[in-house]
Amino acid sequence: MRLTHVLSHTLGLLALGATAEAFSRSREAACSPKKPFRPLPTSSSRDKTCHVRSHGDGSDDSDYILSALHQCNHGGKVVFDEDKEYIIGTALNMTFLKNIDLEVLGTILFTNDTDYWQANSFKQGFQNATTFFQLGGEDVNMYGGGTINGNGQVWYDLYAEDDLILRPILMGIIGLNGGTIGPLKLRYSPQYYHFVANSSNVLFDGIDISGYSKSDNEAKNTDGWDTYRSNNIVIQNSVINNGDDCVSFKPNSTNILVQNLHCNGSHGISVGSLGQYKDEVDIVENVYVYNISMFNASDMARIKVWPGTPSALSADLQGGGGSGSVKNITYDTALIDNVDWAIEITQCYGQKNTTLCNEYPSSLTISDVHIKNFRGTTSGSEDPYVGTIVCSSPDTCSDIYTSNINVTSPDGTNDFVCDNVDESLLSVNCTATSD
């Protein structure tokens, strides 16, 4: 990956912006500059403290962790002490929590027992998502600036041998209503870094994500965040170095604010993929993405929808035929460098045969999309094109707007591929179709 002066300058700015202020009980006040779609509840005060014990010899500390959580639940704070390492070798269901803080000052490390985790991690019922733990309940905060390490290298190597293995997600936020996550350092997740499911009113603030493979086997599917069946989520002030979506809004994600992120090496900030499962209805609406720097990536703004016919992106990712809608999506203010597509909208996800895709157009509509205030330079890999907006039918896309898109290829071109979309609403230079 090339490091430009633009990237260096932006990283310097992001280093200041991505460090969350001291933990605040007022989640609403912590959100800046944009405010969430709906007010976030304030966290109640805590009146007792429990310190988690550690064996200190590499043994599983899960029982100590559960003991502290039960002891300080309903109004306390659980502390993972600085300069201590806590080993987790047991799948932990922590969805019983209420009015509790987890202050992570030290390091939490998951074991590399791949057989155990494949058999015992929590199956989340979407794609192949499984999680090391489930953190949920009401008014739960996890912060402190410490490190959570997923021991991912063994998983990267194993996945290269068998792409059907179940790789755990590092942070399973499942059924949480009211919470603040961060600041934290997340390292070497086997798969996604966050899976946020059936949750609401959660703020992620000051998350530092990194974890590249140390072998020839890539760290794949390491999304920064995937939201699923969740509402009123804020993700802000974070730095993400990964190998897949920086943030992905999965089915039935609503009222999501993402702001002040630096994403490096990713697949962009993505709506979807959606419409993967036949006879299921997927909805993503009311999403605002603001002030993003995106470097060394495949995309910046991305909307990916499966067509109306079965398709296969890979052996472990197949689908098509679902219905639903994408509505009221805004991408506002982005700086890009070495990104393949500044904008990529497709209703043919997983289907390389455009003719077949058009014969079986997606049943999932895209409308009321606003993309504005982009600047920077693409990678040139799609030269002369810098973006693509391809719908499977003019009946399935409407009210897609772009404005102030100042993005060029390294050769100075700024062409777009446009299909089945109202070009009069686009400020970009549509010069080709996907045929």
UniProtKB/Swiss-Prot annotation:
Primary location: secreted
GO molecular function: galacturan 1,4-alpha-galacturonidase activity; polygalacturonase activity
Disulfide bonds, paired cysteine numbers: C246-C263, C391-C397
UniProt entry keywords in alphabetical sequence: Cell wall biogenesis/degradation, Disulfide bond, Glycoprotein, Glycosidase, Hydrolase, Repeat, Secreted, Signal
Cell membrane keyword on record: no
SUPFAM superfamilies in the cross-refs: Pectin lyase-like
Catalytic class of the enzyme: hydrolase
Region named Disordered: 31-55
GO biological process terms, semicolon-separated: cell wall organization; pectin catabolic process
Pfam families: Glyco_hydro_28
UniProt-annotated catalytic positions: D244 (proton donor), H267
InterPro entries assigned: Glyco_hydro_28 (IPR000743), Pectin_lyas_fold (IPR012334), Pectin_lyase_fold/virulence (IPR011050)
Record field: catalytic activity: [(1->4)-alpha-D-galacturonosyl](n) + H2O = alpha-D-galacturonate + [(1->4)-alpha-D-galacturonosyl](n-1)
Transmembrane annotation, as ranges: none
Signal peptide: 1-22
Annotated Gene Ontology cellular component terms: extracellular region
Compositional bias annotation for Basic and acidic residues: 45-55
Record EC number: 3.2.1.67
Keyword Hydrolase attached: yes
Record: glycosylation sites: N93, N112, N128, N198, N252, N264, N291, N296, N328, N353, N406, N429
Localization of this protein: Secreted
PbH1 repeats: 199-229, 230-251, 253-273, 326-347, 361-409
PROSITE patterns the UniProt entry points to: POLYGALACTURONASE (PS00502)
Family: Belongs to the glycosyl hydrolase 28 family.
Function: Specific in hydrolyzing the terminal glycosidic bond of polygalacturonic acid and oligogalacturonates.
Protein name: Probable exopolygalacturonase X
